[in-house]
């Protein structure tokens, strides 16, 4: 496929679809042709297509037939169905995070707060099995769109671990901001959970990835998660929460704070915070404590650029950084936010895999380990932090 254009289609027309298309324009070394888009919200998808000069497909089937790669940029509830359809047609599936999950029993009475979390774990593991089985039978592959894996700071830490033979003893990290873009995120039946999965999947997957890197470098096999404990809270739904108007506070049946503790099979650990209660922009970081070094990966914000603005209106038409809140005073504008968060590098790597069969760092097994850990964490949180074993794939 290296000598010809790789035809690509996007499913979904929201936030994720927007940055996927933007970063596809930055892929080098592979001729990527974005053919078109399909979305359940037809007016939104039509507008998305018109703005980018691409085709608006009337059905998912028509899009899949016209392309080599399908980008799954929908709410998580639709990920499995779309990815499996693409794989069954022999196409590659770029699947946004989280890979899959549990989205309720389909009843009107479903309540994300009260249902047995063991049901979610069993259903999520079954979904993973179906997706990986479809991949095994396909000429295509699942390309898991976990941008943290490809963030420059995480890849530099990968180099340090590989070249120094480091033993990673403890990692701790966070993804947090003032609330998700997506209206559907407020409901478990669409998002598969709240902060633990929606935010926590990023630093968690980066931590799982780096332990895989360490294991391959030191022992020839990845080091996998073994057990997890967690707590979750719905802080903006507390009876006494005072809404000052700065945080999203319309969540229906999901958590807005989580703390997850992972124990790996070698006894080392990782702690992941995730929340919707942090002002001042996105707070994304991962710190690594190893036997021979310490690294802090500052994904967002970072201090590559700092700017002081005395009057808010001066920066009215200037993008500073995602979810900054105010542009007045000292800020840390991201000179290239997509680059620091790994989006273009992710797409570049995926299309090297598609076109030239190069090794894939963020694959379905890493995604499966993340989902297995996350839903085991929900089982733990239901028991107020009891340790739960993790099935590793």
Task: Please tell me what each predicted stretch does.
Residues 69, 80-146:
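Beta-strand-loop-alpha-helix segment that lines the small-molecule cofactor/substrate pocket
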